[in-house]
Amino acid sequence: MKAADLYTFLREPLRAAAKTDPVLIAADDSGLCVDALNGAPGVLSARYASRNGESASDRDNVEKLLSELEEVPDGKRSASFVCAISAILLRNPEGPVELYATEGRLPGVISRAPHGTNGFGYDPVLYLPEYGKCVAELEPDCKNAVSHRGKALRQLAYRYYGIY
């Protein structure tokens, strides 16, 4: 499909929906990016330990990550949770379709063993030096305040409301 055709394909249903209210459609993806692994597991975070392309268990993913980093010294274990959000907005049926992209990051260091139970995925192994604990050890309110998803969503809200 040509880009112009795709644009038309997306624009027309948006125009119909925007006759009553602005329409915002967003999609996101998140992952853990480890510097010593050249950004892996990245977009494959949920399937990192998978052998068949399906999602792997959190435990299997964490075990694979820690195994791959076993020989990496403490000073070289930097990583970030990253959330990318893309959104399209149509404020009125005759207006242009607006495109937005935001990114939120939560930088830290991969610990040598899992810690904490407040979370999922790689939360038990992303250590945040400024808090002295892994993400899974943070209280929910604190975790929500610093999360990569929260940062990306706040950027999107700022852009949306900042020009609305």
Residue ranges of model-derived segments:
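Anionic-ligand binding patches
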Residues: M1-Y164
